[in-house]
Design a protein with these regions (language model features):
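Cytosolic regulatory protein-protein interaction regions
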Residues: 45-222, 226
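Acidic/serine-rich, low-complexity amphipathic helices located in mid- to C-terminal regulatory regions
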Residues: 1-87, 256
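Generic signature of intrinsically disordered, low-complexity segments enriched in small/polar residues
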Residues: 5, 32, 84, 123-124, ...
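Intrinsically disordered, low-complexity regulatory regions with latent secondary structure
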Residues: 220-256
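Amphipathic alpha-helical surface "interface" segments used
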Residues: 24-31, 104, 133, 241-244
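A generic structural signal for nonpolar/aromatic side chains embedded in well-ordered alpha-helices
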Residues: 29, 117, 179, 234-239, ...
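Amphipathic alpha-helical interaction segments
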Residues: 37-38, 59-60, 128, 237, ...
Length: 256
């Protein structure tokens, strides 16, 4: 069903959504598609230039900035960049990466994207009513996107010092704590579907090392699963497998 909707929207093109009802339909789809593509590493037509231009025009025309629409666009851009980052680096022999102009260009582009993400947060912090659940959701996604984007650079050692976006441990911990706090508030005091929280919770869980912390994420995912979103179980299974791998790697490092 979701695939069929995607194809219909794609074939119609961005110019087909002139009415407010059509725009709401497209915006709802964008939120779901952004979550899907960033969690599973898939490509999306929403990252194509004509769809990005459409999104930019609609944001500029709004009387009040839509924080959900703008963070959704950043999720789509970050997901597309992530896919390209891995594809391009893997295509370069390892011994050539350190001095590759492609790698240098990726570092620069990644830094610029990180700046855009941070600028989004700065603009949102100036807006009123941070207690609004959709603002809270947008903030949870911001912290998750920042973790996701910066973590992607840690999988390679081909970067020159100071050329890539990085988070220190205090910043990582701050993002994770914020995600858990915001997701709990959203689940307990709003009607926002829990499935929309899966990406932030997955990113928070991926940065937890202690069992009591991981249980906190499990409990929130169980709440989402019990509310009818069975995909939460899949996310929990993925996290458990990741935690087992992470623990094995930590054990190997300690034994060396």
């Amino acid at each position: 069903m979701f695939y069929g909707t995607s194809k219909v929207l794609q074939l119609a093109g961005p110019d087909a959504y002139a009415s407010s009802l059509q725009q709401r339909l497209l915006n709802a789809f964008r939120v779901l598609e952004a979550n899907r593509t960033i969690m599973f590493g898939d490509a999306t037509f929403l990252s194509e230039s004509k769809w990005r231009v459409y999104s930019s025009i609609n944001h500029e025309g709004a009387e009040i900035p839509d924080c959900m629409a703008s963070i959704t666009e950043l999720m789509i851009q970050t997901s597309a960049f992530s896919k390209r980052l891995f594809e391009q680096i893997e295509s370069i022999p390892e011994e050539e990466r350190l001095f590759s102009p492609t790698v240098a260009a990726l570092a620069h582009e990644g830094t610029e994207l990180d700046r855009k993400i941070c600028n989004w947060y700065d603009s949102i912090s100036l807006q009123p009513d941070p207690a609004d659940p959709f603002t809270q959701l947008a903030l949870a996604k911001y912290h998750a996107v920042r973790l996701f984007h910066c973590r992607n650079f840690t999988y390679y050692t081909c970067w020159l010092p100071g050329t890539i976006p990085q988070l220190d441990q205090m910043e990582i911990d701050g993002c994770v704590v914020a995600i858990i706090y915001l997701c709990e508030k959203i689940l307990h005091s709003s009607n926002i579907p829990g499935a929309i929280l899966l990406f932030p919770l997955r990113m928070a869980g991926a940065h937890y090392k202690f069992e009591w912390q991981r249980n906190h994420v499990r409990n929130l995912l169980n709440q989402i699963h019990k509310s009818g979103f069975v995909v939460a179980e899949r996310i929990q299974i993925d996290l458990v497998e990741f935690w087992e791998f992470q623990d094995d790697q930590d054990s190997i490092q300690l034994s060396v």
